[in-house]
Amino acid sequence: MSSTQGRKRSRLACETCRELKRKCDGNQPCGACVRFEYDCIYNKQTNTNKRRKTVEQDKEAPLPSPPVHVDKDARPYVTSPHHLQSLEANSGAAFFRRLALRLDPKNAPRMHTFSWNAFLGARRTSQVPVSRPVTEMLSQEGMESLSEIYFEKLDPIYGFIDRDWISRITQNRWSGLICDESEDAVLCGIAAIACLFSEVEPLPLELDLIESARFILEQNMSDTPSVTGVTGWLLRVIYLRTAETPHTAWMASSILMHMLEAAGLHCEPSEESVFQVAEEKVDSELRRRLFAVSAHLNIWISFDMGRSRTILCNSTLEMPSTREGDYTIEIMELLPYSTDLDPHKTHDAAELEASLSTVLKRVHSVPPSIMAQCNLTLCLCRRLQSMNTSFTGKTLEQILSITQRGIEAAQAIIDARAPWHQMANVPFQIICLLLAIDTRESLAQLNDAMQCLNNIATVYNTNATKEALNTASLLILMQQRRKEKCASNLSNIVKSFPILPLSETQVEAPLQQMDDMRWFNNLAGELSGFDYSDLDRFLSQSMF
Protein backbone atom coordinates (compact mmCIF):
# COMPACT_ATOMS: atom_id res chain seq x y z
CA MET A 1 0.00 0.00 0.00
CA SER A 2 1.33 3.44 -0.88
CA SER A 3 2.40 5.55 2.08
CA THR A 4 0.59 8.56 0.61
CA GLN A 5 -2.83 6.96 0.59
CA GLY A 6 -5.27 8.69 2.94
CA ARG A 7 -7.62 7.06 5.40
CA LYS A 8 -10.68 5.64 3.67
CA ARG A 9 -14.09 6.73 4.91
CA SER A 10 -17.53 5.63 3.87
CA ARG A 11 -19.42 8.34 2.03
CA LEU A 12 -22.67 6.87 3.30
CA ALA A 13 -23.74 6.54 6.91
CA CYS A 14 -26.98 5.10 8.26
CA GLU A 15 -29.28 7.22 10.41
CA THR A 16 -28.52 5.16 13.55
CA CYS A 17 -24.76 5.72 13.27
CA ARG A 18 -25.38 9.43 12.63
CA GLU A 19 -27.50 9.68 15.79
CA LEU A 20 -24.96 7.80 17.92
CA LYS A 21 -21.98 9.51 16.21
CA ARG A 22 -20.41 6.19 15.30
CA LYS A 23 -18.22 5.24 12.35
CA CYS A 24 -20.40 3.58 9.68
CA ASP A 25 -19.01 1.28 6.97
CA GLY A 26 -21.85 2.14 4.56
CA ASN A 27 -23.04 -1.45 4.15
CA GLN A 28 -26.70 -2.48 4.29
CA PRO A 29 -26.94 -3.33 7.13
CA CYS A 30 -23.75 -1.75 8.46
CA GLY A 31 -21.36 -3.56 10.79
CA ALA A 32 -22.17 -1.41 13.85
CA CYS A 33 -25.93 -2.04 13.57
CA VAL A 34 -25.37 -5.79 13.10
CA ARG A 35 -23.12 -5.95 16.15
CA PHE A 36 -25.48 -4.05 18.47
CA GLU A 37 -28.75 -5.29 16.89
CA TYR A 38 -29.95 -1.86 15.75
CA ASP A 39 -32.29 -1.21 12.85
CA CYS A 40 -30.08 0.03 9.99
CA ILE A 41 -31.91 2.77 8.05
CA TYR A 42 -30.55 5.04 5.33
CA ASN A 43 -31.99 8.39 4.33
CA LYS A 44 -32.01 8.20 0.54
CA GLN A 45 -32.44 11.93 -0.08
CA THR A 46 -29.63 12.87 2.28
CA ASN A 47 -27.32 10.27 0.84
CA THR A 48 -28.01 11.42 -2.73
CA ASN A 49 -27.27 15.04 -1.85
CA LYS A 50 -24.11 14.09 0.03
CA ARG A 51 -22.86 11.96 -2.85
CA ARG A 52 -23.41 14.88 -5.24
CA LYS A 53 -21.54 17.28 -2.92
CA THR A 54 -18.72 14.82 -2.38
CA VAL A 55 -18.18 14.33 -6.12
CA GLU A 56 -18.04 18.10 -6.65
CA GLN A 57 -15.59 18.56 -3.79
CA ASP A 58 -13.35 15.71 -4.96
CA LYS A 59 -12.66 17.51 -8.24
CA GLU A 60 -10.70 20.21 -6.41
CA ALA A 61 -9.51 18.19 -3.44
CA PRO A 62 -5.77 18.31 -2.61
CA LEU A 63 -3.63 15.21 -2.45
CA PRO A 64 -4.33 13.14 0.68
CA SER A 65 -1.99 13.50 3.65
CA PRO A 66 0.13 10.58 4.84
CA PRO A 67 -1.79 8.32 7.23
CA VAL A 68 -1.49 8.92 10.96
CA HIS A 69 -0.24 5.83 12.73
CA VAL A 70 -2.07 5.05 15.97
CA ASP A 71 -1.01 2.56 18.59
CA LYS A 72 -3.79 0.00 18.47
CA ASP A 73 -2.93 -1.31 21.92
CA ALA A 74 -3.03 2.11 23.59
CA ARG A 75 -6.70 1.75 24.63
CA PRO A 76 -7.95 -1.67 23.58
CA TYR A 77 -11.24 -1.31 25.46
CA VAL A 78 -12.49 1.55 23.27
CA THR A 79 -13.66 -0.78 20.51
CA SER A 80 -14.73 -3.55 22.87
CA PRO A 81 -18.42 -4.50 22.41
CA HIS A 82 -18.69 -4.87 26.19
CA HIS A 83 -17.33 -1.36 26.74
CA LEU A 84 -19.78 0.20 24.26
CA GLN A 85 -22.67 -1.83 25.63
CA SER A 86 -21.92 -0.72 29.20
CA LEU A 87 -21.36 2.88 28.11
CA GLU A 88 -24.80 2.99 26.49
CA ALA A 89 -26.53 1.22 29.38
CA ASN A 90 -25.05 3.70 31.87
CA SER A 91 -26.46 6.60 29.85
CA GLY A 92 -30.15 7.27 30.32
CA ALA A 93 -30.20 9.16 27.01
CA ALA A 94 -28.74 6.21 25.09
CA PHE A 95 -31.13 3.79 26.82
CA PHE A 96 -34.06 5.99 25.83
CA ARG A 97 -32.86 6.02 22.21
CA ARG A 98 -32.50 2.24 22.07
CA LEU A 99 -35.95 1.79 23.61
CA ALA A 100 -37.49 4.17 21.07
CA LEU A 101 -35.75 2.38 18.18
CA ARG A 102 -37.11 -0.92 19.44
CA LEU A 103 -40.67 0.39 19.69
CA ASP A 104 -40.75 2.23 16.36
CA PRO A 105 -37.53 2.55 14.32
CA LYS A 106 -39.10 4.93 11.80
CA ASN A 107 -40.55 7.44 14.27
CA ALA A 108 -38.09 7.15 17.16
CA PRO A 109 -37.15 10.55 18.69
CA ARG A 110 -33.55 11.65 18.40
CA MET A 111 -30.98 10.88 21.08
CA HIS A 112 -31.11 13.73 23.57
CA THR A 113 -30.70 14.29 27.31
CA PHE A 114 -34.42 14.78 27.89
CA SER A 115 -35.25 15.96 31.42
CA TRP A 116 -31.56 15.99 32.49
CA ASN A 117 -32.67 18.91 34.64
CA ALA A 118 -35.67 21.21 34.61
CA PHE A 119 -33.97 24.03 32.70
CA LEU A 120 -31.21 22.81 30.33
CA GLY A 121 -29.68 26.27 30.13
CA ALA A 122 -32.96 28.15 29.82
CA ARG A 123 -32.80 29.80 33.26
CA ARG A 124 -32.19 33.26 31.86
CA THR A 125 -33.54 36.80 32.04
CA SER A 126 -33.59 39.58 29.47
CA GLN A 127 -30.55 41.17 31.14
CA VAL A 128 -26.99 40.11 30.36
CA PRO A 129 -25.25 38.74 33.50
CA VAL A 130 -22.54 41.02 34.91
CA SER A 131 -19.64 40.13 37.20
CA ARG A 132 -19.61 42.37 40.29
CA PRO A 133 -18.27 42.27 43.87
CA VAL A 134 -20.64 40.38 46.12
CA THR A 135 -20.98 43.41 48.42
CA GLU A 136 -22.42 45.41 45.51
CA MET A 137 -25.05 42.76 44.80
CA LEU A 138 -26.13 41.93 48.35
CA SER A 139 -26.32 43.48 51.77
CA GLN A 140 -24.95 41.51 54.70
CA GLU A 141 -28.50 40.71 55.77
CA GLY A 142 -29.32 39.51 52.25
CA MET A 143 -26.27 37.25 52.20
CA GLU A 144 -27.12 35.82 55.61
CA SER A 145 -30.71 35.18 54.50
CA LEU A 146 -29.58 33.31 51.38
CA SER A 147 -27.06 31.34 53.45
CA GLU A 148 -29.92 30.20 55.67
CA ILE A 149 -31.78 28.88 52.62
CA TYR A 150 -28.66 27.09 51.37
CA PHE A 151 -27.95 25.37 54.69
CA GLU A 152 -31.61 24.41 55.05
CA LYS A 153 -32.16 22.92 51.58
CA LEU A 154 -28.83 21.83 50.13
CA ASP A 155 -26.32 21.32 52.95
CA PRO A 156 -28.14 18.34 54.57
CA ILE A 157 -27.59 16.35 51.34
CA TYR A 158 -24.31 17.80 50.07
CA GLY A 159 -22.66 18.71 53.36
CA PHE A 160 -19.12 19.90 52.62
CA ILE A 161 -19.03 23.47 54.01
CA ASP A 162 -18.41 24.60 57.59
CA ARG A 163 -21.31 26.88 58.48
CA ASP A 164 -19.30 28.79 61.09
CA TRP A 165 -16.66 29.55 58.46
CA ILE A 166 -19.30 31.05 56.16
CA SER A 167 -20.55 33.22 59.02
CA ARG A 168 -17.00 34.47 59.67
CA ILE A 169 -16.14 35.33 56.06
CA THR A 170 -19.53 37.02 55.64
CA GLN A 171 -18.85 39.17 58.68
CA ASN A 172 -15.33 39.98 57.48
CA ARG A 173 -16.39 40.76 53.92
CA TRP A 174 -19.02 43.32 54.88
CA SER A 175 -16.75 44.77 57.57
CA GLY A 176 -14.32 45.87 54.87
CA LEU A 177 -11.53 43.48 55.82
CA ILE A 178 -9.23 42.18 53.08
CA CYS A 179 -10.46 38.76 51.97
CA ASP A 180 -9.25 35.98 49.72
CA GLU A 181 -10.88 36.45 46.32
CA SER A 182 -11.86 32.76 46.30
CA GLU A 183 -14.04 33.45 49.34
CA ASP A 184 -16.14 35.76 47.18
CA ALA A 185 -16.61 32.87 44.73
CA VAL A 186 -17.86 30.69 47.59
CA LEU A 187 -20.28 33.37 48.82
CA CYS A 188 -21.57 33.99 45.28
CA GLY A 189 -22.01 30.25 44.72
CA ILE A 190 -23.98 29.78 47.93
CA ALA A 191 -26.19 32.79 47.19
CA ALA A 192 -26.83 31.69 43.57
CA ILE A 193 -27.86 28.18 44.62
CA ALA A 194 -30.10 29.64 47.34
CA CYS A 195 -31.83 31.80 44.70
CA LEU A 196 -32.27 28.74 42.47
CA PHE A 197 -33.79 26.76 45.33
CA SER A 198 -36.14 29.52 46.47
CA GLU A 199 -37.36 31.21 43.26
CA VAL A 200 -39.25 29.38 40.52
CA GLU A 201 -38.49 32.16 38.03
CA PRO A 202 -34.86 33.36 37.72
CA LEU A 203 -33.82 36.75 39.06
CA PRO A 204 -31.12 38.94 37.47
CA LEU A 205 -29.34 38.74 40.85
CA GLU A 206 -28.98 34.95 40.57
CA LEU A 207 -27.36 35.17 37.15
CA ASP A 208 -25.02 37.97 38.23
CA LEU A 209 -23.96 35.88 41.23
CA ILE A 210 -23.13 32.80 39.17
CA GLU A 211 -21.33 34.92 36.56
CA SER A 212 -19.26 36.62 39.27
CA ALA A 213 -18.29 33.24 40.74
CA ARG A 214 -17.31 31.95 37.29
CA PHE A 215 -15.13 34.98 36.59
CA ILE A 216 -13.22 34.64 39.87
CA LEU A 217 -12.72 30.88 39.57
CA GLU A 218 -11.51 30.96 35.97
CA GLN A 219 -9.26 33.95 36.65
CA ASN A 220 -7.46 32.00 39.39
CA MET A 221 -7.10 28.68 37.52
CA SER A 222 -3.35 29.16 37.03
CA ASP A 223 -2.78 29.51 40.79
CA THR A 224 -2.18 26.56 43.11
CA PRO A 225 -5.68 25.40 44.13
CA SER A 226 -6.81 25.97 47.69
CA VAL A 227 -9.60 24.37 49.70
CA THR A 228 -11.58 27.59 49.28
CA GLY A 229 -11.10 27.55 45.50
CA VAL A 230 -12.10 23.88 45.25
CA THR A 231 -15.20 24.62 47.34
CA GLY A 232 -16.11 27.42 44.93
CA TRP A 233 -15.73 25.06 41.96
CA LEU A 234 -17.90 22.42 43.60
CA LEU A 235 -20.65 24.98 44.23
CA ARG A 236 -20.42 25.98 40.56
CA VAL A 237 -20.76 22.35 39.42
CA ILE A 238 -23.84 21.87 41.63
CA TYR A 239 -25.47 24.94 40.10
CA LEU A 240 -24.59 23.90 36.54
CA ARG A 241 -25.87 20.35 37.10
CA THR A 242 -29.17 21.77 38.29
CA ALA A 243 -29.71 24.54 35.74
CA GLU A 244 -27.37 24.30 32.75
CA THR A 245 -26.59 21.99 29.84
CA PRO A 246 -24.83 18.62 30.25
CA HIS A 247 -21.69 19.65 28.35
CA THR A 248 -21.15 22.78 30.47
CA ALA A 249 -21.60 20.81 33.68
CA TRP A 250 -19.32 17.98 32.51
CA MET A 251 -16.50 20.38 31.62
CA ALA A 252 -16.73 22.13 34.99
CA SER A 253 -16.91 18.80 36.82
CA SER A 254 -13.77 17.55 35.05
CA ILE A 255 -11.93 20.74 36.02
CA LEU A 256 -13.11 20.31 39.61
CA MET A 257 -11.65 16.80 39.83
CA HIS A 258 -8.28 18.01 38.57
CA MET A 259 -8.40 20.89 41.06
CA LEU A 260 -8.98 18.39 43.86
CA GLU A 261 -5.95 16.40 42.77
CA ALA A 262 -3.74 19.48 42.39
CA ALA A 263 -4.73 20.60 45.88
CA GLY A 264 -3.94 17.15 47.32
CA LEU A 265 -7.50 16.69 48.57
CA HIS A 266 -8.17 13.39 46.81
CA CYS A 267 -6.25 11.09 49.16
CA GLU A 268 -5.56 10.52 52.82
CA PRO A 269 -2.24 11.99 54.06
CA SER A 270 0.50 9.37 54.27
CA GLU A 271 3.99 9.63 55.74
CA GLU A 272 5.11 6.70 53.60
CA SER A 273 4.58 8.55 50.31
CA VAL A 274 6.81 11.26 48.86
CA PHE A 275 3.96 12.69 46.80
CA GLN A 276 2.76 16.12 47.79
CA VAL A 277 -0.27 16.29 50.03
CA ALA A 278 -2.42 19.32 50.77
CA GLU A 279 -0.25 22.22 51.87
CA GLU A 280 -3.10 23.66 53.92
CA LYS A 281 -4.16 22.11 57.16
CA VAL A 282 -7.49 20.58 56.15
CA ASP A 283 -10.02 18.95 58.43
CA SER A 284 -10.21 15.27 57.41
CA GLU A 285 -14.02 15.27 57.60
CA LEU A 286 -14.26 18.26 55.29
CA ARG A 287 -11.71 16.82 52.86
CA ARG A 288 -13.57 13.51 52.57
CA ARG A 289 -16.88 15.25 52.01
CA LEU A 290 -15.44 17.57 49.35
CA PHE A 291 -13.98 14.63 47.46
CA ALA A 292 -17.04 12.38 47.78
CA VAL A 293 -19.59 14.95 46.58
CA SER A 294 -17.29 15.98 43.72
CA ALA A 295 -16.77 12.36 42.65
CA HIS A 296 -20.51 11.62 42.90
CA LEU A 297 -21.36 14.47 40.53
CA ASN A 298 -18.51 13.73 38.11
CA ILE A 299 -19.41 10.04 37.85
CA TRP A 300 -23.08 10.57 37.08
CA ILE A 301 -22.62 13.54 34.76
CA SER A 302 -20.14 11.42 32.79
CA PHE A 303 -22.38 8.35 32.80
CA ASP A 304 -25.38 10.37 31.62
CA MET A 305 -23.43 11.79 28.68
CA GLY A 306 -21.59 8.60 27.79
CA ARG A 307 -18.26 10.34 28.39
CA SER A 308 -15.15 9.51 30.39
CA ARG A 309 -15.22 10.28 34.08
CA THR A 310 -12.13 11.76 35.70
CA ILE A 311 -10.28 8.99 37.54
CA LEU A 312 -7.63 10.28 39.95
CA CYS A 313 -4.57 8.17 40.69
CA ASN A 314 -3.95 7.33 44.34
CA SER A 315 -7.39 8.58 45.37
CA THR A 316 -8.89 7.20 48.56
CA LEU A 317 -12.41 7.30 49.88
CA GLU A 318 -13.10 6.97 53.57
CA MET A 319 -16.50 7.58 55.08
CA PRO A 320 -16.85 10.60 57.38
CA SER A 321 -18.62 10.32 60.67
CA THR A 322 -22.37 10.74 60.76
CA ARG A 323 -23.95 13.81 62.28
CA GLU A 324 -27.52 14.64 63.18
CA GLY A 325 -29.61 16.09 60.38
CA ASP A 326 -26.99 15.28 57.73
CA TYR A 327 -27.64 12.73 54.96
CA THR A 328 -24.45 13.19 52.92
CA ILE A 329 -23.26 9.82 54.21
CA GLU A 330 -26.19 8.13 52.42
CA ILE A 331 -24.97 9.55 49.10
CA MET A 332 -21.36 8.62 49.83
CA GLU A 333 -22.22 5.01 50.66
CA LEU A 334 -23.56 4.62 47.11
CA LEU A 335 -20.22 5.64 45.56
CA PRO A 336 -18.59 2.16 45.55
CA TYR A 337 -21.53 0.77 43.57
CA SER A 338 -21.41 3.73 41.19
CA THR A 339 -17.69 3.39 40.48
CA ASP A 340 -18.15 -0.34 39.86
CA LEU A 341 -20.38 0.57 36.90
CA ASP A 342 -17.46 2.14 35.05
CA PRO A 343 -17.69 0.86 31.44
CA HIS A 344 -14.03 -0.21 31.54
CA LYS A 345 -14.79 -2.75 34.26
CA THR A 346 -16.16 -6.16 33.33
CA HIS A 347 -18.99 -7.59 35.41
CA ASP A 348 -21.19 -10.58 34.74
CA ALA A 349 -24.93 -10.59 35.40
CA ALA A 350 -24.54 -12.33 38.77
CA GLU A 351 -22.27 -9.56 40.10
CA LEU A 352 -24.63 -6.83 38.91
CA GLU A 353 -27.61 -8.67 40.40
CA ALA A 354 -25.80 -8.84 43.74
CA SER A 355 -25.14 -5.08 43.62
CA LEU A 356 -28.77 -4.43 42.69
CA SER A 357 -29.98 -6.57 45.58
CA THR A 358 -27.79 -4.64 48.04
CA VAL A 359 -28.87 -1.23 46.73
CA LEU A 360 -32.55 -2.24 46.82
CA LYS A 361 -32.27 -3.19 50.50
CA ARG A 362 -30.73 0.14 51.54
CA VAL A 363 -32.83 2.61 53.52
CA HIS A 364 -32.63 6.26 52.44
CA SER A 365 -34.28 8.95 54.49
CA VAL A 366 -35.02 12.12 52.52
CA PRO A 367 -36.26 12.79 48.95
CA PRO A 368 -32.94 13.81 47.31
CA SER A 369 -31.18 10.80 48.83
CA ILE A 370 -34.03 8.49 47.77
CA MET A 371 -33.72 9.78 44.22
CA ALA A 372 -29.97 9.08 44.24
CA GLN A 373 -30.75 5.51 45.33
CA CYS A 374 -33.42 5.24 42.63
CA ASN A 375 -31.08 6.64 39.99
CA LEU A 376 -28.45 4.00 40.81
CA THR A 377 -31.13 1.30 40.73
CA LEU A 378 -32.25 2.44 37.28
CA CYS A 379 -28.68 2.26 35.99
CA LEU A 380 -28.15 -1.23 37.39
CA CYS A 381 -31.42 -2.34 35.76
CA ARG A 382 -30.33 -0.88 32.42
CA ARG A 383 -27.01 -2.70 32.64
CA LEU A 384 -28.76 -5.99 33.41
CA GLN A 385 -31.28 -5.49 30.62
CA SER A 386 -28.41 -4.94 28.19
CA MET A 387 -27.41 -8.52 29.12
CA ASN A 388 -30.96 -9.74 28.37
CA THR A 389 -31.76 -10.24 32.06
CA SER A 390 -35.46 -10.19 32.93
CA PHE A 391 -36.91 -9.14 36.28
CA THR A 392 -39.50 -11.34 37.97
CA GLY A 393 -40.86 -12.24 41.37
CA LYS A 394 -39.46 -10.54 44.44
CA THR A 395 -36.77 -8.66 42.52
CA LEU A 396 -39.38 -7.02 40.30
CA GLU A 397 -41.46 -6.13 43.35
CA GLN A 398 -38.44 -4.47 44.98
CA ILE A 399 -37.59 -2.55 41.80
CA LEU A 400 -41.15 -1.26 41.47
CA SER A 401 -41.14 -0.33 45.15
CA ILE A 402 -38.00 1.78 44.65
CA THR A 403 -39.37 3.42 41.49
CA GLN A 404 -42.58 4.27 43.34
CA ARG A 405 -40.52 5.84 46.14
CA GLY A 406 -38.56 7.74 43.50
CA ILE A 407 -41.77 9.17 42.04
CA GLU A 408 -42.99 10.18 45.49
CA ALA A 409 -39.61 11.76 46.29
CA ALA A 410 -39.72 13.81 43.08
CA GLN A 411 -43.22 15.01 43.96
CA ALA A 412 -42.05 16.03 47.45
CA ILE A 413 -39.23 18.04 45.88
CA ILE A 414 -41.69 19.79 43.55
CA ASP A 415 -43.87 20.67 46.53
CA ALA A 416 -40.82 22.12 48.32
CA ARG A 417 -39.90 24.18 45.21
CA ALA A 418 -36.34 22.83 45.44
CA PRO A 419 -35.40 21.79 41.88
CA TRP A 420 -32.82 19.09 42.59
CA HIS A 421 -31.10 18.01 39.41
CA GLN A 422 -32.75 14.55 39.50
CA MET A 423 -36.24 15.96 40.02
CA ALA A 424 -37.23 15.57 36.35
CA ASN A 425 -34.61 13.03 35.28
CA VAL A 426 -35.61 10.22 37.64
CA PRO A 427 -39.35 10.19 36.73
CA PHE A 428 -38.51 10.28 33.01
CA GLN A 429 -36.02 7.41 33.31
CA ILE A 430 -38.52 5.48 35.45
CA ILE A 431 -41.01 5.73 32.57
CA CYS A 432 -38.38 4.37 30.16
CA LEU A 433 -37.59 1.45 32.47
CA LEU A 434 -41.26 0.62 33.09
CA LEU A 435 -41.85 0.44 29.34
CA ALA A 436 -38.73 -1.69 28.86
CA ILE A 437 -39.74 -4.16 31.61
CA ASP A 438 -43.17 -4.32 29.95
CA THR A 439 -45.19 -6.30 32.48
CA ARG A 440 -48.67 -5.62 33.77
CA GLU A 441 -47.21 -4.54 37.11
CA SER A 442 -44.67 -2.16 35.60
CA LEU A 443 -47.13 -0.59 33.17
CA ALA A 444 -49.59 -0.01 36.02
CA GLN A 445 -47.09 2.45 37.54
CA LEU A 446 -46.89 4.60 34.40
CA ASN A 447 -49.78 6.84 35.38
CA ASP A 448 -48.11 7.96 38.63
CA ALA A 449 -44.83 8.66 36.84
CA MET A 450 -46.56 10.65 34.09
CA GLN A 451 -48.57 12.63 36.63
CA CYS A 452 -45.36 13.52 38.45
CA LEU A 453 -43.69 14.61 35.20
CA ASN A 454 -46.77 16.69 34.37
CA ASN A 455 -46.63 18.38 37.78
CA ILE A 456 -42.98 19.27 37.20
CA ALA A 457 -43.84 20.84 33.84
CA THR A 458 -46.67 22.79 35.49
CA VAL A 459 -44.51 24.29 38.25
CA TYR A 460 -41.30 24.71 36.22
CA ASN A 461 -42.85 25.60 32.89
CA THR A 462 -39.76 25.40 30.67
CA ASN A 463 -39.10 23.99 27.22
CA ALA A 464 -37.03 21.25 28.88
CA THR A 465 -39.86 20.00 31.12
CA LYS A 466 -42.50 20.28 28.38
CA GLU A 467 -40.29 18.42 25.91
CA ALA A 468 -39.66 15.68 28.49
CA LEU A 469 -43.40 15.30 29.12
CA ASN A 470 -44.23 15.20 25.41
CA THR A 471 -41.45 12.71 24.70
CA ALA A 472 -42.62 10.42 27.51
CA SER A 473 -46.16 10.56 26.09
CA LEU A 474 -44.79 9.71 22.66
CA LEU A 475 -42.95 6.68 24.04
CA ILE A 476 -46.14 5.41 25.65
CA LEU A 477 -48.07 5.99 22.41
CA MET A 478 -45.44 4.02 20.48
CA GLN A 479 -45.75 1.19 23.00
CA GLN A 480 -49.54 1.29 22.73
CA ARG A 481 -49.51 1.09 18.92
CA ARG A 482 -47.04 -1.77 19.03
CA LYS A 483 -49.26 -3.72 21.40
CA GLU A 484 -52.40 -2.91 19.40
CA LYS A 485 -50.73 -4.31 16.30
CA CYS A 486 -49.83 -7.50 18.19
CA ALA A 487 -53.38 -7.76 19.55
CA SER A 488 -54.82 -7.26 16.06
CA ASN A 489 -52.64 -10.05 14.69
CA LEU A 490 -53.80 -12.40 17.45
CA SER A 491 -57.42 -11.44 16.84
CA ASN A 492 -57.12 -12.20 13.12
CA ILE A 493 -55.71 -15.64 13.91
CA VAL A 494 -58.60 -16.40 16.28
CA LYS A 495 -61.09 -15.30 13.60
CA SER A 496 -59.43 -17.61 11.07
CA PHE A 497 -59.35 -20.53 13.47
CA PRO A 498 -62.48 -20.27 15.67
CA ILE A 499 -62.93 -22.44 18.75
CA LEU A 500 -65.00 -25.55 17.95
CA PRO A 501 -66.71 -27.76 20.62
CA LEU A 502 -65.20 -31.20 21.25
CA SER A 503 -67.30 -34.32 20.73
CA GLU A 504 -68.45 -36.08 23.92
CA THR A 505 -69.81 -39.20 22.15
CA GLN A 506 -66.79 -41.35 22.97
CA VAL A 507 -68.35 -43.70 25.52
CA GLU A 508 -65.06 -45.41 26.34
CA ALA A 509 -63.28 -42.12 27.17
CA PRO A 510 -61.89 -41.93 30.74
CA LEU A 511 -63.88 -39.96 33.30
CA GLN A 512 -61.14 -37.30 33.68
CA GLN A 513 -61.04 -36.79 29.90
CA MET A 514 -64.84 -36.40 29.82
CA ASP A 515 -64.64 -33.72 32.52
CA ASP A 516 -61.95 -31.90 30.55
CA MET A 517 -64.14 -31.94 27.44
CA ARG A 518 -67.13 -30.52 29.32
CA TRP A 519 -64.95 -27.76 30.81
CA PHE A 520 -63.57 -26.85 27.38
CA ASN A 521 -67.03 -26.83 25.77
CA ASN A 522 -68.43 -24.63 28.54
CA LEU A 523 -65.54 -22.19 28.05
CA ALA A 524 -66.03 -22.25 24.28
CA GLY A 525 -69.72 -21.53 24.77
CA GLU A 526 -68.98 -18.52 26.94
CA LEU A 527 -66.48 -17.16 24.41
CA SER A 528 -68.78 -17.78 21.45
CA GLY A 529 -70.83 -14.72 22.38
CA PHE A 530 -67.77 -12.48 22.21
CA ASP A 531 -67.74 -9.75 19.59
CA TYR A 532 -64.26 -9.88 18.05
CA SER A 533 -64.10 -6.11 18.00
CA ASP A 534 -64.52 -6.33 21.77
CA LEU A 535 -61.68 -8.84 21.81
CA ASP A 536 -59.44 -6.29 20.13
CA ARG A 537 -60.14 -3.79 22.86
CA PHE A 538 -59.86 -6.42 25.57
CA LEU A 539 -56.43 -7.55 24.42
CA SER A 540 -55.17 -4.00 24.02
CA GLN A 541 -56.23 -2.97 27.50
CA SER A 542 -54.93 -6.05 29.24
CA MET A 543 -51.57 -5.81 27.50
CA PHE A 544 -51.08 -2.06 28.01
From Swiss-Prot:
Cellular component annotations (GO), alphabetically ordered: nucleus
BP GO terms, sorted: DNA-templated transcription; response to xenobiotic stimulus
GO molecular function: DNA binding; DNA-binding transcription factor activity, RNA polymerase II-specific; zinc ion binding
Chief subcellular location: nucleus
Name assigned to this protein: Protein RDR1
Pfam families: Fungal_trans, Zn_clus
Feature: DNA-binding region: 14-40
Keyword terms: DNA-binding, Metal-binding, Nucleus, Transcription, Transcription regulation, Zinc
Gene name per UniProt: RDR1
PROSITE patterns with a match to the protein in the record: ZN2_CY6_FUNGAL_1, ZN2_CY6_FUNGAL_2
Ranges where the record places region Disordered: 50-71
InterPro entries listed in its UniProt record: Metabolite_Synth_Reg, Transcription_factor_dom_fun, Zn2-C6_fun-type_DNA-bd_sf, Zn2Cys6_DnaBD
Subcellular locations according to the entry: Nucleus
Purpose of the protein: May act as a transcriptional repressor of multidrug resistance genes.
